[in-house]
Amino acid sequence: MDTPSSGSDSFDFEAALKELEGLVERMERGELSLEESLRQFERGVELTRACQKALQEAEQKVETLIGQGADAHEQAFEDPAHRDT
């Protein structure tokens, strides 16, 4: 199965992420042969790169939209994992 370019309209981020999670689960169980593990790992790398590219493109789009606002200033994204509670 080929990974479509994350810039194309046919890329489904959620489906790619779900597939990646499934790959990780199968590999963590340790029941795969070495060859199958390598194939799964390679697919995981492809999915990870495509998802990262899609996220970067989304971030750029958000920054562009924010920049088009009346006060046109850049706002940093807050990482919920590092938020003070």
UniProtKB/Swiss-Prot annotation:
Enzyme Commission (EC) number: 3.1.11.6
A Pfam family assignment: Exonuc_VII_S
InterPro entries hit by this protein: Exonuc_VII_S (IPR003761), Exonuc_VII_ssu_sf (IPR037004)
One CC-aspect GO term: exodeoxyribonuclease VII complex
Major subcellular location class: cytoplasm
Enzyme class: hydrolase
Location relative to the cell: Cytoplasm
Cell wall biogenesis/degradation among keywords: no
Keyword annotations: Cytoplasm, Exonuclease, Hydrolase, Nuclease
Catalytic activity: Exonucleolytic cleavage in either 5'- to 3'- or 3'- to 5'-direction to yield nucleoside 5'-phosphates
Role played: Bidirectionally degrades single-stranded DNA into large acid-insoluble oligonucleotides, which are then degraded further into small acid-soluble oligonucleotides.
Name of the protein in its database record: Exodeoxyribonuclease 7 small subunit
Gene that produces this protein: xseB
